[in-house]
């Protein structure tokens, strides 16, 4: 664990880096890693979507976001006990929620809610970095403006890349612009 930073009221972004700075396994935007958790005498795994650009794996970095579920077993443990410098066991990238040129349309509409934005954040970053070539419109639901995960980053990527468009929808408050 290289860095932990807040990302909304109940979400933390966790920056994972290789111990020696070596590149990490490459991934496609939309994939996830499984993290092994040793909690007391229990060993379990949880899948977390990678939210960083696939280009970051070359510099030995993955990003995940973890939302605290007050009734959860792993997420409170992650948020309360993980510290910078902690070593983790994670799988290589997995999953098929990525853009496939031969399979998918050139214009993609993604629906996301809350921390479910993470795979689409990776896609937006990949588009910005020139690693993918499709048009992405994200319809992103949040309860409140304060609860929008990656709000600033989404705005920056959309401003920098004309292939990324974000439409925010709020369920628990009415605000101009949403």
Task: Name every feature range the model reports, one short phrase each.
Residues 1-87, 106, 142-144, 155-158, ...:
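Ferredoxin-reductase
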Residues 71-178:
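FNR/FR-type flavoprotein reductase catalytic core
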